[in-house]
């Protein structure tokens, strides 16, 4: 049985004070919902602080991105080696904001995916369609292509030690949430697509749903057969709200 995972992506938010308050406010939720893994992905500058604050807790953490290179003249980047040294378990790769704002292709995402397990991190592969692609009925083709880039680069079994985050781009931070039935349809398709290549991988890999996940809808979303938790944005910045989302995964 796949363990539930609820991961907060703080994006470009937080201060030293808010990080301390937020982590301290999540300690009980992580302890009380023992069947759920609770993780946070802070901005890189706050990772050392999160490392210290989570030392004696059940909270895990990761980065929002990592570079394809492990060292060198790459100003502004953070390598998987560096992130691992500061205790990160995870790193997001291919978040839609990286794909759209920074122009990261599926091939670049596949390169980032490949370098993370080589250096001890678990990649959280983010995939999903835009509103235009959704309305054109292209969702399944889009997520298949995004997955195929990784499979071509690293092989299907690389997903044994990875997490998939499905985020319909049109639902991220917009307040527009897919119904539980629609939210379940694409993770189910992802698992079916994987099963055609390796049934064991398909059964093992955790698939998270992201896109305006909040306390009011978390239990119903996480209750779907092929959704193993959530990749949570805005609600993860409030300890009370995020704790309720976490509880939804253990309901």
Swiss-Prot record:
The keyword Translocase does not apply. GO terms for molecular function: triose-phosphate isomerase activity. Belongs to the triosephosphate isomerase family. It is found in: Cytoplasm. The keyword Phosphoprotein does not apply. Substrate binds at residues 9-11, 173, 212, 233-234. It catalyses: D-glyceraldehyde 3-phosphate = dihydroxyacetone phosphate. Keywords: Cytoplasm, Gluconeogenesis, Glycolysis, Isomerase. Homodimer. PANTHER family: TRIOSEPHOSPHATE ISOMERASE (PTHR21139:SF42). Its main location: cytoplasm. The gene is tpiA. One of its GO terms (cellular component) is cytosol. This is Triosephosphate isomerase. Its EC number is 5.3.1.1. Pathway: Carbohydrate biosynthesis; gluconeogenesis; Carbohydrate degradation; glycolysis; D-glyceraldehyde 3-phosphate from glycerone phosphate: step 1/1. InterPro entries: Aldolase_TIM, TIM_sf, TrioseP_Isoase_bac/euk, Triosephosphate_isomerase, Triosephosphate_isomerase_AS. Involved in the gluconeogenesis. Catalyzes stereospecifically the conversion of dihydroxyacetone phosphate (DHAP) to D-glyceraldehyde-3-phosphate (G3P). The active site is at residues 95, 167. GO terms for biological process: gluconeogenesis; glyceraldehyde-3-phosphate biosynthetic process; glycerol catabolic process; glycolytic process.
């Amino acid at each position: 049985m796949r363990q539930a995972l609820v991961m907060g992506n703080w994006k470009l938010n937080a201060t030293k004070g808010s990080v301390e308050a937020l982590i301290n406010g999540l300690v009980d939720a992580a302890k009380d919902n023992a069947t759920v893994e609770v993780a946070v992905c802070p901005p890189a500058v706050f990772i050392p602080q999160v490392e210290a604050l989570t030392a004696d807790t059940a909270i895990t953490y990761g980065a929002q991105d990592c570079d394809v290179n492990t060292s060198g003249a790459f100003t502004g980047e953070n390598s998987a080696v560096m992130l691992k040294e500061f205790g990160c378990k995870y790193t997001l790769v291919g978040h839609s904001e990286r794909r759209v704002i920074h122009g990261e292709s599926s091939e670049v995402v596949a390169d980032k995916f490949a370098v993370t397990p080589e250096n001890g991190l678990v990649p959280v592969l983010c995939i999903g369609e835009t509103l235009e692609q959704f309305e054109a009925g292209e969702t399944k083709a889009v997520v298949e292509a995004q997955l195929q880039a990784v499979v071509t680069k690293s092989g299907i079994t690389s997903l044994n030690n990875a997490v998939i985050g499905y985020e319909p781009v049109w639902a991220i931070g917009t307040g527009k949430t897919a119904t539980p039935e629609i939210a379940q349809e694409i993770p189910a398709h992802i698992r079916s697509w994987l099963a055609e290549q390796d049934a064991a991988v398909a059964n093992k890999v955790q698939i998270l749903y992201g896109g305006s996940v909040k306390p009011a809808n978390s239990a119903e979303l996480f209750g779907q057969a092929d959704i193993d938790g959530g990749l949570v944005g805005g609600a993860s910045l409030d300890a009370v709200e995020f704790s309720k989302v976490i509880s939804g995964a253990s309901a």
